Amino acid sequence: MKHLTLYISLFYLIGCNLFQGQQQAGESVAVEEKQVEVFVPVQKELYVIKEGAIKYKIPDINVKAQSQYSYGEPLWVVGVSKHFYKCNEGNEEEYILKEDADNYEKLKLTQEELEESNFILKGRQKNSTTGSLSTYLSISLITKQEYQKAIKNKVDFFIRDTLTFQKKDKVLSIVCEEAVVKFKDIIGELSRVDESYEYIGRIDTLNQYVVSSQVGDGYGEITIDKRSGRKITFDHLPFISPNRKHLFMITTEIYSEPDNFSLYKVESTNPFVSKLIITAELSNWKIYNIEENDVFFSKNGYLYASINPINSFLDSKGELNKQRMYIKIGIRN
């Protein structure tokens, strides 16, 4: 009986010690989970590389997320810990998991994402659809080296010629075979909107003269048919395919607004007649800078452009992002 009592006592003591050991170990894990993140000061720019990455107000994964970052969003990082980056957002501090942010080079756009649109208008239809542009275009990422090689074979039908037609008494007269087209500058306090026009050149392959226009804060180009004098206004001169069968016109918007483009089929060059195929708004990327000859057709028939993901168009300082990607666009006949 004494032996039985002794065994029971020993089992009780062993069980208590084991329970206390497990409890202490559990308490140790809890302490580790609540460990304070220690941040080391840094100064660098990173980008969100995960769609739906969580934006933390405090560096604690157990805190319920209030909002999310957008893919490609630039971050100005001011601190780094074991698990988090500390970011400056205006006058506030935000935190993102280290695995969700990296250098610009880690950003990727798939062909499906490049060909995605917010809307597509076919011809002159008013009802739009959404979806892929793959029926009309093939768009793919390329290397900078391929882009630079293609620019050596750039095709440009625009001939700069500013002397053929010049203004006289603020009036620019474009003499065509069947008409004289006049543009008058309107500049002064009495006019609600200033207007200014300059002859800048011609596109012989389409039998067009080209006039640049500034109306208020808006800029554009006007083509004038050399024979009839018919005018067509563009936000930017269209890019002409090497086989002269298509026109590709891009309308770029500042900051984070999506870019639009229109694809035309050339039905006649004399007189110049074109048919609108589609107008679309791009979903995921923007042209880097259309004014610096970053967009061009090459002899192989592809349109080349330098771009940025739409959320990376501006850097963390709100300035035009100097980093960029490169694409080529093929027109499906």
Describe each model-derived feature in a short phrase.
Residues 23-39, 88-138:
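Boundary regions of SH3-family modules and the immediately adjacent low-complexity/disordered segments
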Residues 170-190, 215-233, 262-282, 316-333:
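Surface-exposed loop/turn elements that mediate protein-protein interactions on large endomembrane-trafficking
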Residues 1-14:
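Sec-dependent bacterial lipoprotein signal peptides
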Residues 166, 200-206, 238-250, 294-303:
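Blade-terminus and WD-like Trp-Asp/Gly-His loop motifs, strongest in beta-propeller folds
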Residues 17-20:
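Bacterial signal peptide processing site
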Residues 211-216, 249-255, 260-262, 305-311:
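Beta-strand C-termini and the immediately following turn/loop, strongest in propeller blades
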Residues 109-213:
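Terminal domain-start segments
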Residues 26-84, 120-130, 175-189:
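Beta-loop motif signature
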